[in-house]
Amino acid sequence: MASYQRLGALTTLWSPGRGESLAVVRIAFGAIGLLSAVRLVARGWVDTLLVAPAVHLRYPGLEWVPVPPERGIHLLVGVVAVSALGVMVGCWYRVAIVSFWFAFTWLELIEATVYLNHYWFMTLAGALMVFLPMASTWSVDARRH
């Protein structure tokens, strides 16, 4: 009987759950991404850390990632900000999280001297969030459907 009860406990892992915890993670993730983009612009770090250096220190093995021109870097920061806002409110979530991940990771990979360990976490978490149903609760997408 005890083994049957353990099996029953395992089947609850696959039962539908509530989406509020995923919504909280999505909102916090989007807010952190938006704040990181706003901080880059507000402190002038876009120009001093990403645009101005004549030589960019690259990550070993990732030298093939192109460094965009000045307008391209500013555009990437804008994409990070707008897509982070989209992730936060759950508006066109899949498009927002993919564009956030792409732009954020690109900015991270073009300059190794701007390394922050939580940025690597944002990259890994963003990659996972592409495949999770994070916009099923407390989002514009959920209200639309």
Place the predicted regions along the sequence by residue:
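Alpha-helical membrane-anchoring segments
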Residues: 1-145
